[in-house]
From Swiss-Prot:
Allows the formation of correctly charged Asn-tRNA(Asn) or Gln-tRNA(Gln) through the transamidation of misacylated Asp-tRNA(Asn) or Glu-tRNA(Gln) in organisms which lack either or both of asparaginyl-tRNA or glutaminyl-tRNA synthetases. The reaction takes place in the presence of glutamine and ATP through an activated phospho-Asp-tRNA(Asn) or phospho-Glu-tRNA(Gln). Heterotrimer of A, B and C subunits. SUPFAM superfamilies: Glu-tRNAGln amidotransferase C subunit (SSF141000). This is Aspartyl/glutamyl-tRNA(Asn/Gln) amidotransferase subunit C.
Amino acid sequence: MSIDIETARRVAHLARIRVDEADLPALAGELSGILTFMEQLNEVDVEGVEPMTSVTPMRLKRRQDVVTDGDMQDKVLANAPDAREGFFAVPKVVE
């Protein structure tokens, strides 16, 4: 499929990008190349081929969805200038 300059201008307008008139022939050529490649992909026989999301058959490691405190409260509060009763203590902001 061949894209003419007027179609390239319209695509640029729809995409909300500014393209100089001098650059429209190059844009038309690039769009034509993309569409030619897509036409080649449409010719590939994919009958019986399962869709895939990755080239490697990997699964994510799963863990139990359990709420914990992280067992790091003491380490985290050690960085605080003032901590009381297991919480950060901050100066009063609103009277």
